[in-house]
């Protein structure tokens, strides 16, 4: 009989593991969905840098995996676009009288490449 009890306990343990895995997957999917909605909300207000969004979502309590998945979806859908952010940031900074080096340094801290030379020329014509 001891063997039967052990087998039954093993079956219960397996069921618990299976059900907790399903819960974790569902929970991750729900968390990712909430993180994606937060990205949509923030991106609808103004352009967002991927790194800043990542930091904000982690600070707001989302898991690394949920943030990475949601941010990946937003980037794939062009909701978040670091190149577009860089150009908007550049124009804003130049309009405020800031110089090119300062803008480039700020973008480097966000791991964003500097806008193209053509974008700089257009911005200088408009604000410079």
What are these regions (language model features)?
Residues 1-128:
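An alpha-helical, amphipathic repeat domain used for nucleic-acid recognition
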């Amino acid at each position: 009989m001891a063997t039967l009890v052990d087998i039954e306990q093993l079956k219960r343990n397996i069921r618990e593991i299976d059900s907790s895995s399903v819960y974790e997957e569902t929970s991750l999917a729900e968390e990712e969905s909430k993180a994606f909605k937060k990205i949509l909300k923030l991106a609808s207000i103004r352009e967002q840098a991927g790194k800043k969004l990542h930091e904000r979502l982690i600070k707001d309590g989302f898991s690394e995996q949920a943030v990475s998945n949601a941010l990946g979806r937003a980037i794939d859908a062009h909701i978040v676009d670091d190149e577009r952010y860089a150009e908007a940031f550049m124009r804003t900074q130049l309009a405020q009288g800031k110089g090119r080096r300062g803008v480039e340094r700020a973008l480097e801290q966000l791991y964003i490449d500097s806008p193209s030379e053509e974008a700089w020329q257009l911005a200088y014509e408009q604000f410079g």
